[in-house]
Amino acid sequence: RLFRRQRQMCIRDSPYRCPPGPYERVSMTAHLLKAKNPTAKIIVADPKPKFSKMGLFQEGWGSHYSGMIDWIGSEFGGGSVSVDPDAMTVTIDGEVTKVDACNVIPAMKAGRICEIAGITEGNWAPVSGHTMQSRIDENIHVLGDASAQGDMPKSGYSANSQAKVAAMAVRGALTGSKVFPAKFSNTCWSLIDTNDGVKVGATYEATDEKIAKIDGFVSKTGEAADLRKATYEESIGWYSGITADMFG
């Protein structure tokens, strides 16, 4: 079924893990299909009116995979979706489509361990941005995807940044060492096609209410090919750096 005619992706509403992730997945699927079956179609059902790096992805889809990807946002029924796996059909806003493969991204929530600990409100675990301590049980620190912390996206970069704040807070509590004001950063890279990398990122600070965005940046549409290649290579360097940072 992988290389057949019709593929479908059903995306969830925010928040979810790695905001640009589904759209990079669409891009990589299109990259594969372009080589194996260039007549294939990818239909993307999305309950949101816009998404992370939307202009960049749509520009890339148009230039690399013209006519292959149809994105259906909330305005056109992207949030009204049902799936019949036995019949291999997807219904979008009442219209039934036969598909060869369907990737359904389910609703997300914090892991079971957070529920067992009793530190969730709704789907996520609220925390103080100053320390990443649970707002329900201060003896527990929560970071990364599971946390409801404010403006930071749920990403590996965010989790690593939050881990450093949590570690500093724990060290301060145990040893009495100085705890500096919490500062955070995040960058999310995405690959649209070979050597066509884009990114979005921001810096953040802790307030009493949440982790708040200070400023941000995003790749621009129409960038030169050498800049896009450099952005892709930057993402490879980041991965090498963050794995060394975590695991030595």
Feature map (PLM): residue ranges:
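Single conserved hydrophobic/aromatic residue that forms the stacking wall/gate
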Residues: 1-11
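Histidine-anchored nucleotide/phosphate-binding helix
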Residues: 22-35
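A Rossmann-like FAD-binding core segment of flavoenzymes
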Residues: 34-123
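Short FAD-binding loop at a beta-strand-to-alpha-helix junction that anchors the flavin cofactor
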Residues: 133-152
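A conserved FAD-binding loop/helix module that cradles the flavin
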Residues: 146-186, 190-192, 201
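C-terminal auxiliary extensions adjacent to catalytic cores
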Residues: 201-248
